[in-house]
Regions:
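Active-site donor/metal-binding and catalytic loop motifs
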Residues: 269-286, 316-322, 455, 521, ...
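Short beta-strand-to-loop acidic/aromatic patch adjacent to the donor-nucleotide binding site
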Residues: 154-165, 416-429
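Short, acidic, metal-binding catalytic loop of nucleotide-sugar glycosyltransferases
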Residues: 92-101, 352-362
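Nucleotide-sugar donor-binding/catalytic module of glycosyltransferases
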Residues: 31, 36-288, 302
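Conserved donor NDP-sugar-binding/catalytic core segment of glycosyltransferases
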Residues: 169-205, 426-473
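A short, conserved alpha-helix in the catalytic core of glycosyltransferases
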Residues: 235, 245-271, 300, 433-438, ...
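Glycine-rich, basic loop-to-helix element that forms the pyrophosphate-binding segment
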Residues: 136-152, 396-414
Length: 625
């Protein structure tokens, strides 16, 4: 099929799916943005400014890989019947790097009808000694990549496809990032960068993949690392390179095995790789290569076996995504804490949904009565205790509303292995909601906290994880987007790591709650959940979010903020400042699971205005385990 026609059909299919997922207005808005970027957008918007690249070249002028001061990175690229134009553009992107610390290792499995591949490479070899080449028998992508690795002389390796393009500062940036990690005393064995998709020219990229820092739960659901990944050759040798039995998802499999050895990875938020979209490429969707899913599930199942974990691997909610259904260890008891003041209609809806829909049987519910004034409320409590077996109602002794204090008080009556903070204005949607929350925590190496997908009654997202720094303090991922969509890089449809989740539905190990001292009562209304999650994260635990636990949250979308009441506004401002004081403003504004190239003004994962970090070629690197 003609490549342009193929691309047109892919875009049409994307538009249809986007309309189904998020509605016609969103599709039209997104489509207009695409046309604007493609036809009128600033050229090379993900590349550093020209003066930055010139400064890098000046710094490295006259130097070789041996004396440039940067670690040598050998790029492994299997060749197979590569179109001449694509091959030349790829080779040009290597030889035009701003630093000389790269080596290009080419293993050519092209058939006899594509002898021009060898001819073209040999022409470049005659000019550039940093290109090494070997003609090989075609044994599949993994084996061919392993053959390329046999040519490598570098301390580090990187993977690049034969039809893609390296950003001009890729080798310089990765080399400097490795030196930064060493200076900081952090592991330097495994790094990855951001990437962008393009069809014709990297001067007109289609979209960037701005990734989070290392996120192990997210990596189990999709290969978000992808390009450009750089890792020590010693690690590659230790794990035996790529596995042919995972052809199609060989890189995903490799990254899982590398992470098992390193315990994490370092992320460089620069676009260092351009992934070409054309007929037959995986960047165009796994429909082009359907064997990818089977290979990915094998890679994940083997990862579970190697790490001693038990569970099953299934397809995810969208193509290219997967789901690990962890086996829950034992029969943990969950204590559900529900603060309540009057509003018995909301509470009844909540309790009824818990008792009639929840498949997990080992739970208790503790309603924490907080200064109700309607006599009918207490009549309701009496009736509810008769209707719902085991329901407890305890009386919070303090006056006023303090969400933290109320839940801390309720903890005293809880006997569960886990606590579930739950608002009284939520309603259970799926029977295995509690099972799915437990699934992320109640297994060896599981998260300490897990949050749920909360939806407004109009089927838009209210909560899909919390991103710190949005709006200056914190915001909800993908808020107001139509439910059922994939979100940015599948982030509204996969189990993943977050810095925080909302206290409207938050499962936490009771032992961890006690370890960090519960909720901070200085956060009476706002940010108590964010503060709690950050303290748990700082104690070395992980926070997860799952789309497989769904509840309706009847919080009003149009509810006004506390700024309308002077007293509440002062309290809210004080809690904002306390969040900065306790955790540091810089830490709040840099959420490791949210890319610095994304906006801080909205909750839609759109690009930030200006992309200053990219234009300045700013080299920052963060290792996470």
């Amino acid at each position: 099929m003609n490549v342009r026609l193929k691309r047109a059909r892919e875009l049409a299919g994307y538009a249809v799916q986007l309309t189904k997922d998020e509605g016609l207005p969103t599709m039209l808005k997104r489509g207009a943005g695409f046309v604007k970027r493609r036809c009128f957008g600033k050229r090379a918007r993900y590349l550093p400014a020209k003066k930055v690249l010139e400064a890098q070249r000046a710094e490295m002028a006259g130097k070789t890989a041996a004396d440039c001061g940067l670690p040598t990175i050998s790029i492994l690229t299997p060749l197979y019947n590569t179109p001449e134009k694509y091959l030349q553009e790829f080779l040009d992107s290597f030889v035009n790097q701003t630093a000389p610390n790269g080596q290009l290792c080419l293993a050519d499995a092209s058939d006899a009808e594509h002898a021009d591949v060898k001819r073209i490479v040999e022409e470049y070899q005659a000019k550039y000694q940093r290109i090494v080449y070997k003609k090989i028998e075609n044994k599949g992508i993994a084996a061919n990549t392993n053959a390329a690795a046999e040519l490598a002389a570098g301390e580090y390796l990187a993977l690049a496809d034969h039809d893609d393009i390296l950003a001009p500062h890729a080798m310089y940036t990765m080399g400097k990032a490795i030196l930064q990690l060493r200076a900081q005393g952090e592991p330097d064995g495994f790094l990855y960068s951001d990437e962008a998709l393009f069809s014709k020219s990297i001067q007109r990229p289609m979209v960037a993949h701005f990734k989070p820092d290392y996120a192990p739960d997210y990596l189990l659901c999709c290969n978000y690392i992808c390009h450009l990944a750089v890792f020590q050759k010693a690690l590659w040798d230790e794990i035996g390179g790529e596995r042919p039995e995972c052809d199609g998802s060989q890189d995903h499999d490799l990254f899982l095995r590398l992470a098992e050895k390193t315990g994490g990875a370092a992320h460089v938020p620069q676009v260092l790789y351009y992934w070409r979209v054309h007929a037959g490429s995986t960047s165009g969707g796994t429909d082009a290569k359907p064997y990818v899913a089977a290979a990915a599930k094998k890679a994940l199942a083997d990862h579970l076996a190697r790490t001693g974990c038990t569970g099953t691997v299934e397809d995810g909610l969208f193509p290219s995504t997967y789901r690990v259904k962890w086996d829950i260890v034992g029969d943990p008891k969950v204590s559900i804490l529900i603060p309540n003041k009057d509003h018995t209609d909301d509470l009844e809806k909540c309790l009824h949904s818990i008792w009639t829909k929840t498949s997990w049987e080992n739970f208790e519910v503790i309603v924490i009565e907080n200064n109700s004034t309607d006599p009918a409320t207490f009549t309701y409590y009496k009736e509810a205790r008769q209707r719902y077996d085991g329901l407890q109602v305890v009386n919070y002794p303090q006056k006023g509303f303090n969400f933290s204090g109320i839940n801390n008080f309720g903890r005293q009556y809880a006997s569960g292995d886990y606590l579930l903070l739950l608002n009284n204005d939520v309603e259970v949607r799926n029977a295995d909601w509690l099972t799915e929350l437990l699934r992320q925590c109640a297994h060896p190496g599981g998260a300490a906290i897990c949050g749920a997908e909360l939806l407004y009654p109009d089927e838009t997202l209210q909560h899909a994880g919390v991103v710190t720094g949005l709006g200056g303090y914190a915001g909800h991922s993908h808020k107001y987007r139509k439910a059922g969509g994939s979100g940015y890089m599948f982030r509204a449809a996969t189990v993943q790591d977050f810095s925080a989740v909302t206290g409207a539905c938050l499962l936490v190990k009771t032992s961890v709650w006690d370890e960090v001292g519960g909720l901070d009562e200085a956060f009476a209304v706002a940010f108590n959940d964010v503060d709690f999650c950050l303290r748990v994260r700082d104690a070395g635990y992980r926070i997860a979010w799952t789309p497989y636990a769904q509840l309706t949250h009847y919080e009003s979308k149009s509810r006004g903020g506390d700024e309308k009441d002077p007293v509440k506004a002062r309290r809210f401002a004080a809690e904002q400042q306390r969040l900065y004081a306790v955790h540091g403003k810089a830490n709040i504004l840099h959420d490791p699971y949210y890319n610095p190239n994304l906006t801080m003004d909205r909750e839609d994962f759109s690009e930030s205005n200006g992309l200053r970090g990219l234009k300045e070629g700013r080299i920052t690197v963060q290792w996470r385990g």
